[in-house]
Amino acid sequence: MDSNTVSSFQDILMRMSKMQLGSSSEDLNGMITQFESLKLYRDSLGKAVMRMGDLHSLQSRNGNWRRQLSQKFEEIRWLIEEVRHRLKITENSFEQITFMQALQLLLEVEQEMRTFSFQLI
């Protein structure tokens, strides 16, 4: 995932905000912050996969690493469910497209995190 992915997600959330979908800007900023945090975590997983020495150190810290990974998956699942919920309650087709784009990005990030984490396990 690159900075374009984060920018795309921010653009989508800003469009949501401008459409006044009942989401406060505080909620949307929180979603952007969580998404950026997940992006950084996903990037760190990718870097760890590339460094062989880290695999051994990750295995030695396995319990803590698995708890952290579990927490990150809970965060992204929450974001996915939040976007799905908003998608279900909106009737405007433009808003639905915006939510679909946000959902697609979140699902892509979740898949990338899963791919890297399975390589590390």
Curated annotation (Swiss-Prot):
The keyword ATP-binding does not apply. It is found in: Virion; Host nucleus. A motif (Nuclear export signal) lies at residues 12-21, 85-94. Keywords: Host nucleus, Host-virus interaction, Transport, Virion. One of its GO terms (cellular component) is host cell nucleus. InterPro entries: Flu_NS2. It comes from the Viruses. GO terms for biological process: exit of virus from host cell nucleus through nuclear pore. Mediates the nuclear export of encapsidated genomic RNAs (ribonucleoproteins, RNPs). Acts as an adapter between viral RNPs complexes and the nuclear export machinery of the cell. Possesses no intrinsic RNA-binding activity, but includes a C-terminal M1-binding domain. This domain is believed to allow recognition of RNPs bound to the protein M1. Interacts with protein M1. May interact with host nucleoporin RAB/HRB and exportin XPO1/CRM1. Belongs to the influenza viruses NEP family. Average number present in a viral particle is estimated to be 130-200 molecules. This is Nuclear export protein. It comes from Influenza A virus (strain A/Chicken/Pennsylvania/1370/1983 H5N2). The lineage of its organism: Viruses, Riboviria, Orthornavirae, Negarnaviricota, Polyploviricotina. The gene is NS.
